[in-house]
Curated annotation (Swiss-Prot):
It comes from the Bacteria. Zn(2+) 2 binds at residues 811, 885, 892, 895. It comes from Brucella anthropi (strain ATCC 49188 / DSM 6882 / CCUG 24695 / JCM 21032 / LMG 3331 / NBRC 15819 / NCTC 12168 / Alc 37) (Ochrobactrum anthropi). Zn(2+) 1 binds at residues 71, 73, 86, 89. This is DNA-directed RNA polymerase subunit beta'. Its cofactor is Mg(2+); Zn(2+).
Amino acid sequence: MNQEVMNLFNPQAPAQTFDSIRISIASPEKILSWSYGEIKKPETINYRTFKPERDGLFCARIFGPIKDYECLCGKYKRMKYKGIICEKCGVEVTLSRVRRERMGHIELAAPVAHIWFLKSLPSRIGTLLDMTLKDIERVLYFENYIVTEPGLTSLKEHQLLSEEEYMIAVDEFGEDQFTALIGAEAIYELLASMELEKIAADLRVDLAETTSDLKQKKLMKRLKIVENFLESGNRPEWMIMKIVPVIPPDLRPLVPLDGGRFATSDLNDLYRRVINRNNRLKRLIELRAPGIIIRNEKRMLQEAVDALFDNGRRGRVITGANKRPLKSLSDMLKGKQGRFRQNLLGKRVDYSGRSVIVTGPELKLHQCGLPKKMALELFKPFIYARLDAKGYSSTVKQAKKLVEKERPEVWDILDEVIREHPVLLNRAPTLHRLGIQAFEPTLIEGKAIQLHPLVCTAFNADFDGDQMAVHVPLSLEAQLEARVLMMSTNNILHPANGAPIIVPSQDMVLGLYYLSIVADKEPGEGMMFADMGELQHALENKVVTLHTKIKGRFKTVDAEGKPVSKIYDTTPGRMITGELLPKNVNVPFDICNQEMTKKNISKMIDHVYRHCGQKETVIFCDRIMQLGFAHACRAGISFGKDDMVIPDTKAKIVADTEALTTEYEQQYNDGLITQGEKYNKVVDAWGKATDKITEEMMARLKAVEFDPVTGRQKQMNSVYMMSHSGARGSVNQMRQLGGMRGLMAKPSGEIIETPIISNFKEGLTVNEYFNSTHGARKGLADTALKTANSGYLTRRLVDVAQDAIISEVDCGAEIGLTMQPIVDAGQIVASIGQRVLGRTALDPILHPTTGEVIVEAGRMIEEKDVEIIEKAAIQSIRIRSALTCETRNGVCAKCYGRDLARGTPVNQGEAVGVIAAQSIGEPGTQLTMRTFHLGGTAQVVDSSYLEASYEGTVKLRNRNVVRNSDGNLVVMGRNMAVLILDNTGKERAVHRVTYGSRLFVDEADTVKRGQRIAEWDPYTRPIMTEVEGYVEFEDLVDGLSVSESADESTGITKRVVIDWRSTPRGSDLKPAMVIKDKAGKILKLSKGGDARFMLSVESILSVEPGAHVKAGDVIARLPMESAKTKDITGGLPRVAELFEARRPKDHAVIAEIDGTVRFGRDYKNKRRIIIEPNDDTIEPVEYLIPKGKPFHLQDGDVIEKGEYILDGNPAPHDILAIKGVEALASYLVNEIQEVYRLQGVLINDKHIEVIVRQMLQKVEITESGDTGYIPGDHVDRIELEEINERLIEEGKKPGSGNPVLLGITKASLQTPSFISAASFQETTRVLTEAAVAGKMDTLQGLKENVIVGRLIPAGTGGMTNQIRRIATARDELIIDERRKSSGSTEANAMLVDMTNNAAE
């Protein structure tokens, strides 16, 4: 009884729990079973009574009552009649909420095709029937008949007949000899009569027999769809609809506006259209109207249903009264405003407020200031409850009155309510998880939220009018999570790189830096101080200043915690900072006995965090913030115009450079250099001049000056202090103020040759000002584009990585990646220690000299290990990586390594995919959109020579050198490398040297660090001869294949190979140079081929015919100009290009095997290159290369697998196919890191690896074996492994496949979860595909769970699920035990066992 009463008052049925969602095509019976009645009239509501019309689109009899528990005519009212159906109006007395759940239907007079299955490419109906979409449409829209049953006539099945042809056929064969139908009925018949099993069997036979690729592809597509239908239990004829479902009326509401008009959902218009046409068609059929009229009506019905499902997909868009296209059912789901992204993935919340933020320096790190007014509003329900509990009010109404009057007791209660109740602060745009953090509110007067200065970096907030939103976590669980996980004190480290993010900035840095300055000849120099008390005393009496050099005693503790002290040479300012350090044996005074620049402060905080833990760090940060502010204020640092110092040498440097540019101009006029070279040189010269002036200026600013009167050191230049400490401003900005503004870019990204010589202190001339506006405007335009692009990149990354969750502790993988330091132009940009910190070692790491184990296999590499590794100079380390992790549905903790935001091993349930996506996407807005190029000079300056980065002995790998006529060693090999070995013979560095480089060292020479090893001309690529002899030209015909180009301004000629294929006469020329001996015989090369050198277009000839050349002499050169002026994709577009795995425009051609290059017969205008393998068991590989491309290999060159045949950016797919997963991973990681490194952004490699792992989830089946897949199918890697294991156990033939690389968009759309894919992009296509295949979504990822409204399977949500599973298992055990109740002890033992597991 009791239960029933409860049910009366809580009519909500408990939510159903479910584990998966399936989508399939609805059969007519299914649609009928959903429906509560047929809709026969197009009417909506009666405009006078506002009551819904009977049998109309809002009919109360079908859909339910309008008011709770009240029938339409008003005969039955109130709860007591629940469930009764009124005999007068036929409405069931129940909740009006059922109008959101009950569906209706429309019985169609003629079948219509469902547009999704017809038009969503590839057309499912078309593929099944093996007809083209055009033909099917002709049948559906009543243009042609289709033969469904040819009988004994000469007609073929599926043959289309026009009206006349049909009439002729009827005359010829008689009407009952064959069947030809028209319209959707015809397609319905064809689909209904399909025997899918038979078709599938036939297709398999055909597949085995056919050889042509195109046919195979077509058959495979068809077979796939047939199998989908067979597996899912869908019937093909269900794609033709006889009944249209009508969605519940409250989901397509009709809202009365004032003035008697109505606002309605577009769906009602679309449904009305369908009902009108359907009713008209029924009437026409009853009246036996002429066929042509009925046919026309049927066509219109088909169009109406098409528009309802997907308006605008076919034919004209149906528009409403205001000429705006009507929103169909598909549009309701699609895009940013669709159901998925607008309502399911992001919902609006109540209990939130927003206001402007101001700084709150007196707050503690875990606090924020909340205006009283705001708090009162946000915590209302809590206040009402507390007022009631304390007896101040007996009803909610009274409580409301008290709060409105703002009585004093309300404020007291507000204080109680707010205590220990965290609130969430959020600043838009929330680019990473630190954009929402929890704080404890403290009540303040005023209307602005106070924010702690140290969390500004995380929120990217400043106080120039930014606003923030406040959210109140209501439930106990929410408060708990906010406090334990989201509290600002728990977010000290940056999830992207593990560096502290709670770092003082600006004023605080300036104050701390000022404290740490050392000055000479200050009063009291050399005094000794025993403790801080004495020092304070001396400071207050001005015996010493903050910057005096003194000796001071610093007290700390040893390992046992006993106090120890030591005397340091330091300054009073540094002693004050040192006082704040936590007392710990690992935190010495040295870390603050140095210049406190922002970097050093960050290192200090990091050090304290690693050794003293979180609590100490938070207290320490708060203290140094206070100290920084106090001393920035006391120091009184400010700057005036005179602080910008213009170097005295500026005029001279400018004059010298102007002289240089005039000289280049002259050289150009004399024809010694080309226009492009002149441009490069001029831009280069000005670039150098700017740098020189900057150096001079900085030297002036840095210089220490003494006051001649007092002899004391003058105060440091304040601008220099600000910039050097990292508080504000950069060298670049100072250069513009006090040096020279330098070169400017045009909007196109080119550099303007004439620089801006003035600086802002001197003022710009009108011309200079005009030139500088270019760059400024481009910057603004770029910023707007950048934000949108960066946001879209983040969205794609999150989508692809959302289901990468830590799901187990150790997957036991035996494979991993090899980490090496990244060297760029001889500089180490990322040391090996930085790269392996916080990763798990795959093999034991051994000391190279002693052989002792530094890190055991399977242990995480910590800071202390990194020190040893760096000292031992280990060059490569094998580590575990998420890329090679073998966990199914997720990643394991061992492969991932350290959780960067906490500095501890990663927890189970951490959503590492989303964190990776945020870490890569968040700095996106800092990347450039297009890179400015200093005319290619910036790259050139540093890439024309090679210096030794270590001391050691030289070894040449693949040595192939000759001495040319100047007596220099010249590199002749294409894959030669210079190795530098240390005294133990270990490789310290490997440098590739390009063909044609001049070598300054030879085998076994010793080199010093910084010694030049080799140099080359960065602007051209040489073609050199290996033999001595006389030059002769072949096919170098003037005007056809060679042109004498005279530089128009100089008159000097040079001979250039031109595109000889452009004229018909030159099509079969092969321009080349040969080297002959005195007798005129062609010489042989060392490899056995002729000394013939093929020339490509744009080669410049360096010798005349008949000239005598020695080995190593350049006979022609290919200018690299083209590669240089071309804008290399940089910044954001480059990152997107890599993640989308696009093939670059002119991508490199990579050799697939080791072997020798041979030239084959040319094919049209392509060159055929054959690589003959060294190993005879492999087939030779052929490549076709466009003839005009600069091509540097010669006949007979030896080439290694993975080497470039044609230069360019390699396509990632090629790297994967040729060199394997590890090479691909290192390529992608390095390339992406390069872009971020240029911007000074630190991102840990593991984030990029997680994303790349998601891109490599699929394999393409090559051998299907007994797997049941078709070659060419894309299958999950781990799924295939599992199937193969099962097949091997059963003794069947396993399948095999090659890994495929998918771009992030493609990979997101191919996730096993259709819900996730549909909410990402191409909603219609994804849902159509899923419905045909009857896909099941097992709700593994985060997105699917958010959409269906469950806890996400990560973090606490994942834990809850696990606990629930354990509980269910235990319950079942107990139930079993009760059943047996014979006192069996096994179940008890199991129970105890399970409890223990759960506890663990």
